[in-house]
UniProtKB/Swiss-Prot annotation:
Organism, scientific name: Pseudoalteromonas atlantica (strain T6c / ATCC BAA-1087)
The entry's keywords: Cytoplasm, GTP-binding, Hydrolase, Magnesium, Metal-binding, Nucleotide-binding, Potassium, tRNA processing
Gene that produces this protein: mnmE
Binding site for (6S)-5-formyl-5,6,7,8-tetrahydrofolate: R29, E86, K126, K460
Domain of life of the native organism: Bacteria
TM region positions: none
Keyword flag Metal-binding: yes
Subunit and interaction comment: Homodimer. Heterotetramer of two MnmE and two MnmG subunits.
Cofactor details (free text): Binds 1 potassium ion per subunit.
Residue positions binding K(+): N232, T251, I253, T256
Enzyme Commission code(s) on record: 3.6.-.-
Name of this chain's protein: tRNA modification GTPase MnmE
Length: 460
């Protein structure tokens, strides 16, 4: 799990830092020990550090290429921690390509790999891995909430919480391992309840961070919403209403939908993956049975399930009373919203009705009545109206690492309570700490780093 930290390549790298295509301004970024030499070739001198200079840009043969702003940042006071040169010219693609070509005439200057500028910033301790990922998340944000969350992660709010947990685990490990390594000191780590209390406090704090990370993941990646229910409840009509188009075939024949239908939509910029499934029932039809099994596979992977029912058939709102078999199979802690469809036929008022632990919505999918209220509810489920102003963006790998750390804390607690095994507790604490450290990159494999930074755009 742990590897030695790499050092940045000795090559100087160059790339276009702005998006490809036409624009008013285009930026070429150079990073490395030869940035000053590139400046001498392109503009004839090295600009004053952190001073914008309006100068002509020339090729290696002295031919004019463009004119614009040159900025020079001296290591380590730059984004990458290396010498950095930025050439800000006009945004025509041909002009920028010629400018990059001119920089490549300097020996040992090469084109940057995707994400290599951010990678060098990480390797030079200018930011940690979670902050580096937040750069890409900020660029790709599809809503204001996602952008704000990514900025908070970039500013280190997520990393601060992870580092706090790592520090707490470090102190607890020192205490436990001291009792193991120095038995003559007679440190009884069970007698005063310190270990148990610390474990409880750390687990509680980790659970809180996990909850925030899951919310942040929904902002970044979108929420998987599965529409489930019996045949002819109106699931496909609801998919069409949310998607704003006829994505699914709708008929009065029960069992029309036999396979999984997926639509990627945005509600006020918030990404959702809406999944329509086959009606759930016992069936002798082989094709329909396969569709039902696929429906359950989607349900088990969902972030939220819309439990669809025909309001003309029951006045009951409690899903356990309506369909106990469905609720018993539903994954524990699954977010569930009850949808009472066909309000136009049952005469029910359109809107939200709260029932115990499950929000209940009365609507008419075919007439698109009550859809806006449901859309607001889905936005709230993603944290659109979250009262937590400190919401940060997180990725699936972050959640996986937190969950693994949580598992090891629980295992350590069991070893302590069942076996009084201090050595095994210490090992579980070490593993929990290592998984959390993967988030910020303190312990990360080369494969993980390569995968993360390769997903960045070239100039980042």
């Amino acid at each position: 799990m742990t590897v030695e930290q790499n050092t940045p390549d000795q090559d100087t790298i160059v790339a276009q830092a702005t998006a490809s295509g036409r624009g008013g301004v285009g930026i070429v970024r150079v990073s490395g020990s030869l940035a000053a030499k590139v400046a001498e070739q392109i503009i004839g001198h090295v600009p004053l550090i952190r001073n914008a200079q309006y100068v002509p840009f020339k090729s290696n043969t002295g031919e004019p290429l463009d004119q614009g702003i040159a900025l020079f940042f001296k290591a380590p006071h730059s984004f990458t921690g290396e010498d950095v040169l930025e050439l800000q010219g006009h945004g025509g693609q041909v002009v920028l390509d010629m400018l990059i070509k001119a920089t490549l005439h300097v020996p040992n200057v090469r084109l940057a790999r995707p994400g290599e500028f951010s990678e060098r910033a990480y390797l030079n301790d200018k930011l940690d891995l979670a902050q580096a990922e937040a750069i890409a998340d900020l660029i790709d944000a599809s809503s204001e909430q996602a952008a704000r969350g990514a900025l908070r992660s970039l500013q280190g709010e997520f990393s601060t919480q992870i580092n706090s947990l790592v520090e707490l685990l470090t102190h607890l490990r020192i205490y436990v391992e001291a009792a193991i390594d120095f038995p003559d000191e007679e440190i009884d780590f069970l007698s005063d309840g310190k270990v148990q209390n610390d474990l409880k406090a750390i687990t509680k704090q980790l659970s809180s961070v996990k909850s925030q990370a899951r919310q942040g993941s929904l902002l970044r990646e979108g929420m998987r919403v599965v529409i489930a229910g019996r045949p002819n409840a109106g699931k496909s009509s609801l998919l069409n209403a949310l998607a704003g188009r006829d994505a699914a075939i709708v008929t009065a024949i029960a069992g029309t939908t036999r396979d999984v239908l997926k639509e990627h939509i945005h509600i006020d910029g918030m990404p959702l993956h809406i999944i329509d499934t086959a009606g759930l029932r016992d069936s002798s039809d082989e094709v329909e049975r396969i569709g039902i099994e696929r429906a359950w596979q989607e349900i088990e992977q969902a972030d939220r399930v819309l439990f669809m029912l025909d309001s003309t058939e029951t006045h009951e709102n409690d899903p356990y009373k309506i369909w106990p078999e469905f609720m018993r199979r539903l994954p524990k802690n699954m977010g569930l919203t009850v949808i009472r469809n066909k309000a136009d036929l049952s005469g029910e008022n359109v809107g939200k009705v709260q029932y115990d632990d499950y929000p209940v919505f009365q609507l008419s999918a075919s007439h698109k009545q009550g859809i806006e209220v449901l859309a607001e509810h889905l936005k709230e489920c993603m944290g659109f109206h979250s009262s937590n102003e400190g919401q940060f963006i997180a990725r699936r790998r972050h959640i996986d690492a937190i969950e693994r750390a949580e598992e090891h804390l629980l295992l350590g607690k069991q070893q302590l309570e069942d076996n009084l095994a201090g050595e095994l507790l210490a090992e579980e604490l070490r593993l929990a700490q290592a998984y959390l450290s993967e988030i910020t990159g303190e312990f990360s494999s080369d494969d993980l780093l390569g995968k993360i930074f390769s997903s960045f755009c070239i100039g980042k």
